[in-house]
Structures are given as C-alpha cells and as structure tokens.
C-alpha cells in the first residue's frame, strides 16, 4: 500500500526541430521572466498552476503554432491576470489545464500490488502452520494432557492425506476481497475516493516436509472518483504470482514471491471553469470539457520474508522481517475531448511514459492463539508492521498540449512519498477436520500522510 512523489524546481521547454530550428531551452520554474514578464507565475497559487502559468507565458504570444481554441484559452488567461479583469477565472483555467490527477494511477499501482502480495503471504502462513498446529493443540482430553503423538493423530485424521500434517501434499484456495480508501487533496495533487473488489485463486504443492511451491492468479476492479467531481479512473488488473516457502524447523520459515500485474486504465479528467472573455458575445467563456484517455501499466515485484514462531501454550508470537521490490511502468497516452468543437477543445494533453521503483522493508509481528473444537479449530490473529520506503523517488509528470505543435514540454511536480508508515491486520481462520478451512481478514494502512486504505478478504482452502 503506497505512494506518491515530490517537487522539481525547473520547467523544461523543448522546441520542436524543423529544417530551420533545432533548439532546446531550459526555463527555470516559478519566478522566470518571459514575454508576459512572469505575471501569470506571480499570480499562481499552487505548483500545478505555476507549471501551467510558465507554459502559457511561453507559448501564448501569437505565432507559436497553436490551434485557434488553445490560442483563445491562453489569451483569456493572460488578459484575466494582466488586466485584472478575472484573476480568479484565470487561476481556475491554469488549474484545469494541469493534469495533477495523473498521479492517481501511480498510487493505484502500488496499492494493488501490496494487497495482492498480502493475500499470498497469508496463504503461505496458514499452509505452513498446519505443520505447527499440533504443537499448539497440546490441549487436554477429559482433564488429561494429550501427548504430541495423540495430538498429531487427531489433527491428521485418516486416509491418504493423514501421512502429512498439512492434510495432503496438494492445496487449493480461492479468496474474494473488497477494499476502500481515500486520499486528501494536497497542493500538488487532487485527492480521491476509491473502492475495489477482486478474486484470487491458486494451488500449491508440498515438495518436501520443509518446502512448498505454488502459483496464484488474480483479478481486481478498482473504481476511483476524484475530489470535487474533477474526474474518475477505472482500473482492471490481472496478475500472476509464483511463491515458495522453506521452513528449516517447525518454527522458522523463509517465504519468497515473484509477481507480475497488467493493468488497463480508463480515465476522465474534467476541465470546468468560467472566465471573462473579450472573444465572446456575452463577455464570458464557459469551459466544460471532459478529457478522456486510456492507458496500460505493468508492475513486477518480488519479496523475501523470514520469521520465527515463539510458542507458549496456545499462543504463538511471530516476529518477521521482509524486503519488497517493485518496478512499475505506465504507458504514455493522449487525451481526446468530449466536445471536439466546443470551448476548451484545445486543452487536451499528451502524457509521456512513466516508471518508478519502490524498495521497502517491513518489520513486524503477529500474535495467534487457538480455540479447539470437536469439528474445527479457530485461530484468531492480529498483527502490525512498520514499513520504510528507500526508493520511489519523485518523478515529475512530463507532457505537452496536443494542439501546441511547437512541442513545448512541461514538467508537473507531484507529492513526495511518505517514507515511514505501517500496516495492521486482524483475522480469523477456521480449520475443519475434513481438510477444508476458511478465513476472514482485515488489513489497514496507518500513518501514511493524507492516505487511508482498507481491505477485507474472505477465503476458503482445501488440502488433499
């Protein structure tokens, strides 16, 4: 569950190469003097406004190869500030032009990968603990403590699967999940509300009494509404995860996972503002456009975790440490306007490819107890972990206005990632004597600035 980015101090403007001109200029960000004397940047109140203000100052002077609509929108903003006729409308226009909503995809990428990995980790934990439950279930029968052999025999049952404390070498599982969360607005990025639902299924095999390998497939749908009705993002994700576990002893383990996810994104960015305009009969221009686009992204990640179980009676404390590495890439995309001939039709953007890497460590612990019954055993569990982000450095969003044929590039700053945060979990597992088991799980993100995420999961498993 993660993450966001940071601010850059420069705006790069690249002039398109022609037979006469091949040049590249670097224009520092806020404070730069341009043909409009930096007035728009001085009036700008947020980093996205400052970025688009610098761009408008650079491309607005006539003759810079703009479409008619884009030239008109630039002129309205410049006049609104320079003449003081509508500074508020001009600032709304600058904010509307900036694609700060683009950062939502980055947040969705890491959130989805983190939830997916947690499902598989819980699967490995229960599969492994089948071997240890007999130790925790050294309960009494009619007041007499059971011997380890008696407890093991009760846990194994009869049939071919009784040769293995897991209930059999093969295991299959199916999980369903539902998640929700929100992110507050910041100076650089638009906040959002999100919900998701998905399903993950897989199978694993007990290679030896000390090792398991498995494969899981997953699908997730996530719907995200941006604050202030400024747009939405719909994401469909499919994933495959290979996993393995090795336990040198009955109480220690090492887990490894490698996953790949493919994500399809459909998004709408709403551009809506009103500004005084000398170019309309009414003296006012009403911009109400939806910039539509779709793109794909991919994430590949791996994790390595080790832990040890300290058992006392029916209670087990499991401290652990984990290393996570994830690399994500988002394809560039080009927007098209909902009203191609209406005011604001020239404000479509083209966003370049993006990529980022996350490297985190997690240190935490889980506490589990057991309540035994005649037909099944219950295993309540709570856990918490501290996560530190080492990488995921800010990458500004690079893009250009589609109707600016000069090819001028803007760099839009984004939020810094939160380097330190936590996850909490609570769950209940029921293991039945016939090899079936079921569980419910809650996972929550805590201590992450401006971001709240929650996930609930229900699942069933069978060993045979």
Show which residues each predicted segment covers.
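Sec/Tat signal peptide C-region and signal peptidase I cleavage site
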Residues: 5, 17-23
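Bacterial N-terminal signal peptides that target proteins for export
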Residues: 1-8
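Outer membrane beta-barrel transmembrane domains
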Residues: 336, 347-464
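Low-complexity repeat regions of mature extracellularly deployed or surface/particle-associated proteins
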Residues: 25, 156-158, 207, 272-273, ...
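Outer membrane beta-barrel translocator domains of Type V secretion systems
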Residues: 80-312, 439-463
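Solvent-exposed, glycine/polar-rich loop segments of beta-barrel outer-membrane systems
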Residues: 186-195, 224-231, 264-296, 329-357, ...
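Short glycine/proline- and aromatic-enriched beta-strand/turn motifs that initiate or cap beta-hairpins
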Residues: 25-77, 88-89, 171-187
């Amino acid at each position: 569950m993660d993450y966001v980015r940071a601010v850059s101090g420069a705006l790069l403007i690249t002039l398109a190469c022609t037979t006469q001109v091949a040049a590249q200029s670097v224009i520092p960000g806020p404070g730069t003097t341009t043909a409009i004397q930096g007035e728009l940047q001085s009036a700008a109140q947020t980093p996205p406004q400052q970025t688009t203000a610098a761009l408008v100052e650079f491309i607005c002077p006539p003759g810079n190869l703009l479409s008619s609509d884009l030239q008109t929108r630039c002129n309205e903003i410049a006049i609104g500030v320079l003449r003081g006729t509508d500074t508020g409308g001009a600032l709304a226009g600058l904010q509307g032009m900036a694609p700060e909503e683009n950062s939502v995809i980055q947040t969705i990428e890491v959130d989805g990968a983190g939830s997916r990995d947690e499902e598989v980790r819980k699967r490995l934990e229960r599969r492994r603990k089948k071997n240890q439950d007999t130790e925790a279930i050294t309960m009494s029968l009619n007041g007499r403590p059971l011997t380890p052999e008696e407890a093991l025999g009760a846990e194994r049952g009869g049939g071919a699967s009784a040769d293995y404390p897991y209930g059999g070498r093969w295991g299959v599982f199916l999980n369903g999940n539902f998640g929700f969360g929100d992110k507050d607005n910041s100076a650089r990025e638009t906040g959002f509300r999100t919900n998701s639902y998905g399903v993950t299924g897989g199978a694993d095999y007990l290679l030896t009494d000390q090792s398991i390998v498995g494969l899981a497939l997953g699908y997730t749908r996530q719907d995200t509404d941006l604050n202030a009705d400024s747009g939405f993002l719909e994401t469909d994700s499919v994933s495959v995860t290979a996993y393995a576990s090795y336990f040198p002893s009955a109480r220690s383990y090492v887990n490894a996972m490698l996953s790949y996810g493919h994500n399809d994104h459909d998004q709408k960015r709403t551009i809506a503002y009103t500004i005084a305009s000398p170019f309309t009969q009414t003296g006012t221009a009403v911009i109400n456009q939806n910039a539509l686009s779709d793109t794909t992204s991919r994430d590949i990640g791996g994790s390595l975790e080790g832990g040890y179980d300290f058992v006392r009676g029916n209670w087990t404390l499991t401290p652990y440490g984990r290393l996570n590495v994830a690399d994500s890439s988002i394809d560039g995309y080009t927007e098209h306007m909902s009203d191609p001939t209406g005011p604001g039709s020239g404000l479509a953007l083209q966003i370049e490819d993006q990529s980022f890497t996350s490297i985190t460590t997690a240190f935490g612990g889980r506490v589990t107890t057991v309540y035994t019954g005649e037909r099944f055993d219950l295993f309540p569990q709570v856990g918490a972990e501290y996560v530190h982000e080492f990488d995921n450095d800010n990458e500004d969003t690079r893009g250009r206005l589609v109707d600016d044929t000069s090819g001028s590039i803007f760099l839009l700053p984004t939020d810094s990632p939160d380097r330190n945060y936590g996850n909490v979990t609570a769950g209940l597992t029921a293991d039945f004597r016939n090899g079936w088991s079921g569980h419910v799980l809650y996972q929550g993100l805590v201590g992450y600035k401006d971001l709240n995420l929650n996930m609930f999961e229900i699942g069933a498993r069978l060993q045979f």
